[in-house]
A protein has these predicted regions:
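Outer-membrane beta-barrel strand-turn architecture
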Residues: 44-48, 101-106, 142, 150-154, ...
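Extracellular loop and loop/strand-boundary signature of outer-membrane beta-barrel proteins
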Residues: 21-28, 78-86, 128-135, 182-191, ...
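Subset of outer-membrane beta-barrel
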Residues: 3, 48-49, 157-159, 200-202, ...
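Face-selective signature of the C-terminal outer-membrane beta-barrel domain
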Residues: 1-123, 151, 211-213
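Membrane-embedded beta-strands of outer-membrane beta-barrel proteins
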Residues: 38-40, 96-98, 144-146, 191, ...
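Outer membrane beta-barrel strand-and-loop segments of large Gram-negative receptors
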Residues: 35-39, 84, 194, 213-245
């Protein structure tokens, strides 16, 4: 069995911010997202006991974010170049996988391998007040999976599973422009963020449909956390960063 599909998503947003404090600030933000994706999957039961799976997927994401901030100075509004920015983000992910399923009298086995390549480019041109924040990031990872289930008596079973997974930073966390919550708290993205990679292992005893008891192990590298940086003047910048392993 072979199936294929394609998708397109378009999203646009606009937001105004008005902060009335010691320094009156007005922000005009807008942006758009274009997402293209396509995938194909093959399922081939080539014998009574074995089934082969294979597939490929590609996705392209393009994001354009604009933030224009102005401060009230006297009776006129003046642009704030420290906070304003125009950020373009492009991401391409290509992936392919293979998996083999095997079923015998008392043992079921699933073994797979997925290869992913990610290419990211972000561009934020600098100005006299703000340095260039453009960046590129390319990485390739292999993700093996394994699941073994052994059937016991009376519908009970033992299972052993392993999988390697990835959690990518979301687009907002990579965006270097500043989002103002209030006069004391600013949000700012981090273009140097790396994805989280985790290894997960579980051994479980399954008692029919009643309950499941297991032992699990997880190791995660480059965990993404929120950091809080005091910039003085009672202003705190909240920014994501990778926790050192």
């Amino acid at each position: 069995v072979l199936d294929a599909s394609m998708d397109y998503l378009r999203y646009r947003y606009e937001e105004d911010q008005y902060l009335n404090s010691q320094d009156t600030l007005f922000g005009d933000m807008d942006g758009g997202i274009h997402l293209y994706s396509g995938q194909a999957n093959l399922v081939w039961p080539f014998s009574k006991s074995f089934t082969f799976h294979a597939g490929a997927k590609t996705s392209f994401v393009s994001i354009d974010n604009n933030a224009d901030y102005n401060r009230l100075q006297g009776d006129s509004w003046q642009p704030d170049h420290d906070l304003s920015c125009d950020f373009q983000y492009d991401e391409n992910i290509n992936a392919g996988y293979v998996q083999l399923d095997a079923k015998f009298s008392s043992i079921s086995l699933e073994a797979g391998l997925r290869l992913e390549n990610t290419r990211i480019e972000g561009e934020q041109s600098g100005n006299a007040y703000q340095r260039d924040s453009s960046f590129t990031n390319h990485y390739t990872h292999l993700f093996p999976t394994l699941s073994v289930q052994y059937a016991l008596r009376n519908g009970n079973s033992l299972s052993l599973t392993y999988g390697k997974r990835i959690v990518r930073p979301n687009y907002r966390d990579l965006n270097p422009f500043v989002y103002i919550h209030d006069e004391y708290t600013y949000d700012k993205g981090n273009t140097l963020l790396r994805p989280e990679l985790s290894d997960n292992l579980e051994l479980a005893y399954i008692h029919g449909d009643l309950f499941r008891v297991g032992l699990a192990f997880n190791y995660t590298k480059d965990v993404i956390i929120k950091s809080y940086l005091d910039q003085g003047n009672y202003v705190v910048y909240v920014s994501p960063e990778n926790l050192s392993s």
